[in-house]
């Protein structure tokens, strides 16, 4: 009798083990899963996969040598209009604003605009907002997000119909480099917590700039980058990329298309979430290795745009430096920096 009970017990244990093993195999093989960083309370639409079972890991664009596209490739007074990966390069004369209004206006879009006004940079908010109210996405719903350590220092600027402003308190860090590297994290968190419910597109720009001419739906795209005004006419070997191999922002001498400015980027809100999260993860990896990229977040932004190509590129008329004379190749300036004492502002 005892032998019989022992045999039955062993048989039951064996069957249970087989059943559990079969269930585990089924879950591993047939049930997909996705991963979201634990600190982001993302809704389902932002449950963006890193890798699904049954798929090969995502491989970014292969780092292979290729000729550098030149913005002034056609003539010194004419800009290139298409990248080698067939993304349009937007500049005056490459689009019909009236036609675009007819296409985009019925879609009832809301466009978000983020700026950081930390410390002495609050002094630029009024001029920035007044110029945005005059030129940025006229006829569309706009949501301004101002991140600041001094909410009381943000001036109240009258806004037009369908245009809202939200002041979001953030911590001030002692070093401006730390503020810069935290920007991607802050935008990523904000999208996950709020912006995905409030806007369709999101642009992230610097506050110490002003709009000087209309900025409209010609800039809308999945992932949008702006060419830096200081490097649009130089070979990529002179771009201020991060050249140290130890950094995740490393770019080889034979890599790169354009040098993009960190002062302007944007796109569909889901794509901006992916982009800022990717940059933030790379910054964290560098921090763990005790390294800070040459130009902080701008170095990581350029590294990511090499492996994740922008779907639309804005010419330097959307990111100009007022200290430079306007070249013949730019018919007008839409968005430009203000002349300022940078050392005083960052002190």
UniProtKB/Swiss-Prot annotation:
Catalytic activity, EC: 2.4.1.88
Active site residues per record: 298
Single GO cellular component term: vesicle
Top-level taxon: Eukaryota
GO molecular function: globoside alpha-N-acetylgalactosaminyltransferase activity; metal ion binding
Record: residues binding substrate: 116-121, 206-208, 228-231
Side Lumenal, residues: 27-347
UniProt similarity note: Belongs to the glycosyltransferase 6 family.
Domain note: The conserved DXD motif is involved in cofactor binding. The manganese ion interacts with the beta-phosphate group of UDP and may also have a role in catalysis.
The reaction(s) this protein catalyses: a globoside Gb4Cer (d18:1(4E)) + UDP-N-acetyl-alpha-D-galactosamine = a globoside Forssman (d18:1(4E)) + UDP + H(+); a globoside Gb4Cer + UDP-N-acetyl-alpha-D-galactosamine = a globoside IV3GalNAc-Gb4Cer + UDP + H(+)
Location of this chain's protein in the cell: Golgi apparatus membrane
Topological domains annotated Cytoplasmic: 1-5
Cofactor(s) demanded: Mn(2+)
GO BP terms: carbohydrate metabolic process; globoside metabolic process; lipid glycosylation; protein glycosylation
Glycan attachment residues as annotated in the record: 108
Membrane spanning residue stretches: 6-26
Membrane topology reported for the UniProt record: Single-pass type II membrane protein
Pathway in which this enzyme or protein is active: Protein modification; protein glycosylation
Residues binding Mn(2+), per UniProt: 206, 208
The protein's name in its UniProt record: Globoside alpha-1,3-N-acetylgalactosaminyltransferase 1
Keyword line: Glycoprotein, Glycosyltransferase, Golgi apparatus, Manganese, Membrane, Metal-binding, Signal-anchor, Transferase, Transmembrane, Transmembrane helix
Cofactor note: Binds 1 Mn(2+) ion per subunit.
InterPro entries linked to this entry: Glyco_trans_6, Nucleotide-diphossugar_trans
Function: Catalyzes the formation of Forssman glycolipid via the addition of N-acetylgalactosamine (GalNAc) in alpha-1,3-linkage to GalNAcb-1,3Gala-1,4Galb-1,4GlcCer (Gb4Cer). Forssman glycolipid (also called Forssman antigen; FG) probably serves for adherence of some pathogens such as E.coli uropathogenic strains.
């Amino acid at each position: 009798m005892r032998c019989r009970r022992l045999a039955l017990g062993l048989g039951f244990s064996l069957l249970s083990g087989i059943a559990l093993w079969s269930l585990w195999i089924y879950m591993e093989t047939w049930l997909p899963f996705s991963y979201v960083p634990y600190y982001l309370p993302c809704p389902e639409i932002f449950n963006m996969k890193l890798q699904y079972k049954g798929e090969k890991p995502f491989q970014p664009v292969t780092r292979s040598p290729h000729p550098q596209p030149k913005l002034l490739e056609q003539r010194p007074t004419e800009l290139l209009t298409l990248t080698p990966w067939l993304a349009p390069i937007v500049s005056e004369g490459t689009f019909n604003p009236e036609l675009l209004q007819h296409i985009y206006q019925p879609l009832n879009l809301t466009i978000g605009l983020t700026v950081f006004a930390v410390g002495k940079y609050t002094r630029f908010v009024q001029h920035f907002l007044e110029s945005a109210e005059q030129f940025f996405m006229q006829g569309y719903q706009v949501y301004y997000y101002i991140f600041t350590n001094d909410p009381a220092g943000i001036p109240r600027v009258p806004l037009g119909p369908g245009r809202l402003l939200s002041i979001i308190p953030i911590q001030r860090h002692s070093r401006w480099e730390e503020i810069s590297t935290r920007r991607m994290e802050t935008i990523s968190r904000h999208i996950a917590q709020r912006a995905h419910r409030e806007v369709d597109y999101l642009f992230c720009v610097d506050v110490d700039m002003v709009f000087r001419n209309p900025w409209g739906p010609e800039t809308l795209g999945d992932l949008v980058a702006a060419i830096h005004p200081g490097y649009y006419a130089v070979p990529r070997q002179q771009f201020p990329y991060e050249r140290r191999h130890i950094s995740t922002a490393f770019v080889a001498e034979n890599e790169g298309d354009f040098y993009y400015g960190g002062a302007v980027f944007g796109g569909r809100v889901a794509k901006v979430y992916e982009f800022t999260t990717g940059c933030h993860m790379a910054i964290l990896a560098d921090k763990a290795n005790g390294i800070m990229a040459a130009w902080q977040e701008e170095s990581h932004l350029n590294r990511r745009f090499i492996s994740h190509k922008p779907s639309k590129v804005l010419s330097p008329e959307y990111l100009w430096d007022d200290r430079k004379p306007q070249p013949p190749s730019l018919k007008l300036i839409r968005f430009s920096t203000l002349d300022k004492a940078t050392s005083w502002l960052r002190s």
